[in-house]
Amino acid sequence: MKRKIVLAMALLGVQSLAWSAEITVAAASSLSDAFKVIAAQFEKQHPAVKVNLTFGSSGTLLQQLRYGAPIDVFASADQKTMNDAQNFFLIQNATRTDFTSNRLVLITSTRNPIIIKDLNELKHANIKHIAIGNPAYTPAGRYAQAVLAQKQLWVPLQSKLIKTENV
């Protein structure tokens, strides 16, 4: 995956390297671990270049881009946000590259005695809170909402949902 992201950085319009000693990468929070490693490797290979990393929800980063934030590379966690960036003419279409994918997972605390094998078990009275990314801002939240709605759990679980800014 790291090679794909490095390739993506090369393809995503890091053409300003000839004029600037800094590039700014805005990436989804879910990509933070990988991008920190990649940025360090990139800086090692290009000692004259400083990579500035900004992480957040894809929706928030898109808004920053829309309002003029100086972003050289934008890495969203989903197609919808990239489509929006393209529709708002915020990215160079020829540089857009799909380089990874997300997977929705359910995790529980080690202190939770309930082992969840089916999403319907989220209705269990002992489960008080369910944290998800806010569907208004995060792809993971939209994916969670879609799955819960498909299983007819979105409405029944509303009182338990804690919507977070990012993953």
Where are each of the predicted segments found?
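Sec-dependent N-terminal signal peptides
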Residues: V6-L11
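N-terminal segment of the mature folded domain
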Residues: S20-Y137
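Bilobed "Venus flytrap"/periplasmic-binding protein-like clamshell domains
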Residues: D33, A136-K151
